[in-house]
Amino acid sequence: MAEKSTKNETALLVAQSAKSALQDFNHTYSKSWTFGDKWDNSNTMFETFVNKFLFPKINETLLIDIALGNRFNWLAKEQDFIGQYSEEYVIMDTVPINMDLSKNEELMLKRNYPRMATKLYGSGIVKKQKFTLNNNDTRFNFQTLADATNYALGVYKKKISDINVLEEKEMRAMLVDYSLNQLSESNVRKATSKEDLASKVFEAILNLQNNSAKYNEVHRASGGAIGQYTTVSKLKDIVILTTDSLKSYLLDTKIANTFQVAGIDFTDHVISFDDLGGVFKVTKDIVVSSDESVNFLRAYGDYQTHKGDTIPVGSVFTYDVSKLSEFKDSVEEIKPKSDLYAFILDINSIKYKRYTKGMLKQPFYNGEFDEVTHWIHYYSFKAISPFFNKILITDQDVTPRTE
């Protein structure tokens, strides 16, 4: 497991970048600073420092790697180019030659060839966030350079935090959705109480360490072309997704002792949340037809939605859209029906790749409002491989989809 990042690391990274940017600016210009004497702050020393030195310097770092909200961040692999489909899919599955490749690739694959080696989640498009700095704020509301710099950095870090929270919600929903819909019936075990669940979690951890073909979904991959595939998981690779209340209970059981004896911090191997819901999946194609829906989606960062757009089945929203007129009875919350829920899996089954280098784009100035708008572009890929062990323990009835 990766080491946890801290707020101190965040502060140190930002401070080092700000110091380096200031040194570069002073070397290029001078050490004598002014906020300018114009009515606006465009092309002044401070505006030049923030947009030409400070933000580009921070853009060279992987600030998104710091713990600003995403508990799955340590799983992410930074890649300069991310293919839409994972290596396992490319190697182990064959796309039929008569498929209509003019459709959206991911949706086309889901509908025409659903039993693929690696289930795909997320649209795989470039996601966008924006933030605006008002020049009058930086010019008139701060007495020192440090105050204004902290203001600019604070807005930027807030957007990075928003990205991480969004990524975390998508990853959590992917795991919950997979556990409730893709596991074999033999890998779903019933529990009747916290005590019973803890006992079955302990048994499952022992089971996953045996070389067996029972605990993966290989028979559902590749269109059923592979009959069985033996897998074994090391204790250090086993993690548990559950609720905060169950985590607090599991920490006081023999399961925690087992990890401790092996020299492993059990707290790092239980990923928990106060609520496993909050993400909504579209169950049928939806046509956006009202200004209310457009305004609502844009308020949550979806700047590209217009009236008449079709939101395809399977699309995921990390906020509640169920009350919008077009979405009523057409979305479902991705959430276990019971609080008795523990998903035990090999961490290698999670495929999480992203491209965030240079994600802060060149800003543009709006003279009407004396504002500078910055856009952040980032790309991520999330998938779950059936070629690793998984067991779900819950008290609800779970029926795998037969698609």
From Swiss-Prot:
Principal location listed in the UniProt entry: virion
One term under GO cellular component: viral capsid
Keywords: Capsid protein, Virion
Organism: Staphylococcus phage S24-1
Protein name according to UniProt: Major capsid protein
Localization terms from the record: Virion
Role this protein plays: Assembles to form an icosahedral capsid.
